[in-house]
């Protein structure tokens, strides 16, 4: 399994752009064109004050077990920045664009990117 942590909006998270994400991936599929897998972006809940850990990695591992490349988005919360519209939604839009832009490196089918969200995370989807 591959695990990588990244800043969403640049090299390092900043006060203005605190969002991060974790890529949890598997090796390319030998029986698929270019070894590409579908991708899922996971947005945990937490009332926009935090992100509940039990709605992140366990969900990612379940999707990995079903053949997906998983991305756990740590969107902006009130403890990290401004949660007013459109900041969390902009984080998700950037995440979708980032997954598609890095499809070759992460062995993702850019036409098969989905999003799952829980509670506050579902509100930004």
Show the residue positions of the predicted features.
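N-terminal cap/lid segment of alpha/beta-hydrolase-fold proteins
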Residues: 1-35
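Short beta-strand element of the alpha/beta-hydrolase
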Residues: 36-45
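Loop/turn elements at helix/coil->beta-strand transitions in domains of secreted/extracellular proteins
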Residues: 37-38, 66-68, 110-112
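Cap/lid segment of the alpha/beta-hydrolase catalytic domain
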Residues: 47-55, 72-87
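Short amphipathic alpha-helix adjacent to the substrate-entry channel of hydrolases
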Residues: 53-71
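Core alpha-helical elements of the protein kinase catalytic domain
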Residues: 61, 93, 97-100
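Gly/Ser-rich "nucleophile elbow"/oxyanion-hole loop immediately N-terminal to the catalytic nucleophile
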Residues: 86, 97-119
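Hydrolases whose catalytic domains are alpha/beta-hydrolase-1, hotdog thioesterase
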Residues: 124-125
């Amino acid at each position: 399994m591959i695990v990588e942590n990244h800043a969403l909006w640049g090299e390092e998270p900043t006060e203005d752009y605190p969002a991060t994400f974790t890529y949890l991936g598997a090796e390319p599929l030998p029986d698929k064109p270019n070894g590409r897998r579908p991708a899922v972006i996971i947005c945990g809940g937490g009332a926009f004050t935090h992100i509940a850990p039990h709605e992140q990695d366990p969900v990612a591992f379940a999707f990995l077990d079903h053949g997906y490349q998983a991305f756990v988005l740590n969107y902006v919360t009130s403890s990290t920045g401004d949660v007013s519209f459109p900041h969390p939604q902009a984080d998700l839009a950037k995440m979708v664009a980032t997954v598609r832009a890095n499809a070759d490196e992460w062995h993702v089918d850019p036409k098969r990117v989905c999003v799952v969200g829980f509670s506050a995370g579902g509100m930004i989807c």
